[in-house]
Regions:
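Tubulin/FtsZ superfamily GTPase core signature
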Residues: 1-195
């Protein structure tokens, strides 16, 4: 029996529409690393309350969340501000992710924007029936107990809204770095892992 190639109807999309969203400073850094590393086949979106960070983004689509609330100055390590900022901009977030088959959310937990806004972004995706996966980092222990507590609370909120979550404790990354790794290099390593 001869082998026959199946007929492909060009009108049927054969690839999943994947959107990768970097939320907050760490998420934006991760997006920039992915773009610089020539990751293809996905749409990159950066969301932040801090307009200076947003201007540094290489993403095609940038969303300034919480314009009225933060005036572009960031969330000040306050997840409640990050949450309210995302809620203020929820309609734009929903429009941006519309049509995706899968959404990846990249962010760092323990600050204001990523910690507070990521669960709202995830909820917007879930409400549209989009498979939603979060890839997040937890703070280094040297960043202090307050930041770790914010991270734990944020993770608890995010877990309720995603289909799957990958948590990367930054302290574990130090195990693969050598003893001469500086702070800046350690944070760059975190961005590389999120990529």
């Amino acid at each position: 029996m001869p082998f026959c190639m199946p007929k492909i109807n060009p009108e049927i999309e054969t690839f999943a529409r994947i959107k990768v969203i970097g939320v907050g400073g760490s998420g934006g850094n991760a997006i920039n690393h992915m773009i610089s590393s020539k990751v293809k086949g996905v749409e990159f979106i950066c969301m932040n309350t801090d307009t200076q960070d947003l201007h540094k983004s290489l993403a095609d689509k940038k969303i300034h969340i919480g314009k009225n609330l933060t005036k572009g100055l960031g969330a000040g390590m306050n997840p409640d501000v990050g949450k309210k900022a995302a809620e203020e901009t929820k309609a734009e977030i929903q429009d941006t992710i519309k049509g995706a088959d899968m959404v990846f959310i990249a962010c760092g937990m323990g600050g204001g924007t990523g910690t507070g806004a990521a669960p709202i972004v995830a909820r917007a995706a879930n409400e549209q029936g989009i498979l939603t996966v979060a890839v997040v980092t937890k703070p280094f222990s040297f960043e202090g107990n307050q930041r770790m507590k914010l991270a734990e609370n944020g993770l608890s909120e995010l877990e309720k809204e995603v289909d799957a979550i990958l948590v990367i404790p930054n302290d574990r990354l130090l195990m693969i770095a050598d003893k001469d790794t500086g702070f800046k290099q350690a944070f760059a390593l975190c961005d590389e892992i999120l990529r």
